[in-house]
């Protein structure tokens, strides 16, 4: 299999000594990202203050993320984590009697349930859809999303097995019931093309450290400009206010657009890193990345099955997973053994996740699968 991004591999120093297929947890750090981190450090070290430069990088990152998902810049908020973003939305969603239902699935990342169950006004109106062999199918959303539903939360990609959801179909179901669609795209942005307008997404969150190739400390929240006015954030701060009221302690005025969800100063070093990572992804093109990844994951599934591995999600053509989830007896021990051989994978629950990115080769994935087959 041809590696179309061979020239980019030199940008990732870790690849010279390791096989890095743990992007579902932490993507490989590139030289441009490292240089951006050094720029932040150097500017602060040499000049003592870099506030103007940091805010400029924040606005650049906001614009790059908006472009990546097909949004407008004023529809993006920059926050510290996906959990903060979800909490911001949950605490700002207005309660309407008879229209207070919250729908999510048992396959969503646990923070989703933690946050929504902490909202007293919505707690008794939560519907957690039970998965069927790790999948939640469209017919289940048809059944559980009703005229009483206020918001449907969906993971575009399942964090344990890579199962991909059909967002447009779920958006149609939600909107038919006058509900909002809130997408957790942490496991998809950077490897799967996202167009929030075409997909009918109302709200979306994604952090930078996984397939976006950044580091922890920054997440992006998209809120459609057609939906923003219904939200009056209670989790807020001075950056969530209109500029004229930021230093008026008595008369706060929520900022226009998604910025109203911002709180205080973010981790600027993470912003610098995310900005560089986003520029790299935009240069390469996520559509091109997806085309290669489809081939690579197809190869991974086929080779894994030939080796007798038990892959969690059945490969059925149209539902090719975005990562390989391999069942093993002792995931932590297997993860440690692989890492001792410079193979970076990610253990989650009872599976080892093999999650390549555009910089990986078929040979690297084959070697990891062969090693897993020898230990399972």
Where are these regions (language model features)?
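Pyridoxal 5′-phosphate
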Residues: 1-376
């Amino acid at each position: 299999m041809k590696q179309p991004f061979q020239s980019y591999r030199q940008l990732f120093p870790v690849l010279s000594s390791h096989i890095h297929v743990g992007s579902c947890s932490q993507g490989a750090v590139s030289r441009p990202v490292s240089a951006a981190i050094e720029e932040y450090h150097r500017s602060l070290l040499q000049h003592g203050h870099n506030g103007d430069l940091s805010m400029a990088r924040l606005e650049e990152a906001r614009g790059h993320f908006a472009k990546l998902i097909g949004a407008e810049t004023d529809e993006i908020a920059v926050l510290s984590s996906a959990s903060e973003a979800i909490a911001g939305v949950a605490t700002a969603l207005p309660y309407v009697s008879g229209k207070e239902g919250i729908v999510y699935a048992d396959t969503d990342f646990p923070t989703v349930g933690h946050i929504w169950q902490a909202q007293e006004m919505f707690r008794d109106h939560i519907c957690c859809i039970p998965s069927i062999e790790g999948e939640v199918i469209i017919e289940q959303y048809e059944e559980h999303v009703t005229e009483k539903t206020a918001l449907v939360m969906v993971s575009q990609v399942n964090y344990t097995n890579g199962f991909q959801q059909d967002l447009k179909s779920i958006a149609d179901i939600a909107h038919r019931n006058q509900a909002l669609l809130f997408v957790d795209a942490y496991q998809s942005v950077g490897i799967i093309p996202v167009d929030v307008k075409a997909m009918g997404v109302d709200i979306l969150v994604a952090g930078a450290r996984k397939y976006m190739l950044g580091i922890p400390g920054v997440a992006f929240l998209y809120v459609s400009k057609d939906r923003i006015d219904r939200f009056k954030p209670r989790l807020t701060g001075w950056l969530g206010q209109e500029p004229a009221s930021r230093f008026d302690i008595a008369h706060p005025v929520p900022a226009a657009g998604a910025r109203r969800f911002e709180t205080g100063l973010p981790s600027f070093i993470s912003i610098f890193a995310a900005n560089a990572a986003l520029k790299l992804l935009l240069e390469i093109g996520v559509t091109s990345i997806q085309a290669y990844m489809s081939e690579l994951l197809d190869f991974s599934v086929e080779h894994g099955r030939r080796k007798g591995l038990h892959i969690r999600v059945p490969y059925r053509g149209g539902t090719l997973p975005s990562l390989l989830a391999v069942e093993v007896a002792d995931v932590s021990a297997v993860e440690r053994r692989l890492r001792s051989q410079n193979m970076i994978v990610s253990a989650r629950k009872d599976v080892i996740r093999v999650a390549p990115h555009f910089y990986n080769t078929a040979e690297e994935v084959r070697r990891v699968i062969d090693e897993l087959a020898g230990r399972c």
